[in-house]
Amino acid sequence: MKHLLQLEWMKYRGNKTMVIFFLATVILYPIGLLLTHTFLTSVIPEDIPVDLFKFPEIWALTGYVVNWISYIFIVLMGMQMITLEYSGKTLRQNLITGLTRAEFLLSKVLFLAVACLVLTLWFGIATLLLGLYAGSEIQLELSEVLKYLFLHFLMVFAYGFVGLVIGLVFKVLALSFILFFIYASFIEPAFAHLVHNNIFGGSSYLYYPANSFKDLLPFPYYVHISEMIEPEDQIQFALSNNHAIIASLIYLGLLGFLAWRKMQRSNF
């Protein structure tokens, strides 16, 4: 396992595109949080006693902000991990020099998991720093901290793994991202809301893949919006944490099987 990680590290440390995607995520996390703080403090009057940056509620807010950053850059990073093998014609070389197809895929997954773990720790640090910057009293409830760190890790890993699988299938970074963006941003939401919801009703339209991953760290104030809606008009805006976790794990399992089958059947 260590050998596989070392092989991946040797590939990526000199790849400018990979470095840019990862560092962009690292840099944009605190920038996004600071911009959010600046915006919210400017639009909420000082005489309204609302503290959006107190603990533990701040975790939901910061998680939602970094969700959007990860949606772009972690997906791109996952795609780059595999498409550079095609563009550099190194995939076949890896297999010829001794790696099995399963080991090749495992090396990608392991490296992605380590990168996501680093980003998760950085997310935790950035959230604490934002709380200090906002003047909030630091209250670290272990269960809340672990919950949001796990949700963040699963979210970024899911985004990255989706990117990896799409890159494995379509082989070109630009094409892979365009297809992902069109599906996740337009096709899935339109079909879920306009077709699925009108036919089946209820909340089942929320269980599509991209939305399941997104709802791991959703917009944090849906509950307040629901309180302003009459009981007979209530709708579910997002999946619960548990349902989002279960749906995400199921989709990751299906994607993992798809990636494994692709690796076994392709003639690289």
Q: For each predicted feature, which ranges?
A:
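Transmembrane helix boundary and interhelical loop/hinge segments in multi-pass membrane proteins
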Residues: M77-T97, R101-A102, V109
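Short hydrophobic, aromatic-rich alpha-helical segments embedded in or entering the lipid bilayer
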Residues: N198-E230
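Central hydrophobic cores of alpha-helical transmembrane segments
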Residues: F21-V26, S176-I187, S203-Y207
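Aromatic- and glycine-rich beta-strand/loop motifs that create alpha-glucan
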Residues: M1-V26
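Secretory targeting signals
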Residues: M18, F22-M81, L106-K171, S185, ...
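Junction motif at the cytosolic side of a transmembrane helix
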Residues: I246-F268
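Residues that define the loop-to-transmembrane-helix transition and helix capping
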Residues: K16-V19, A102, A174-L175
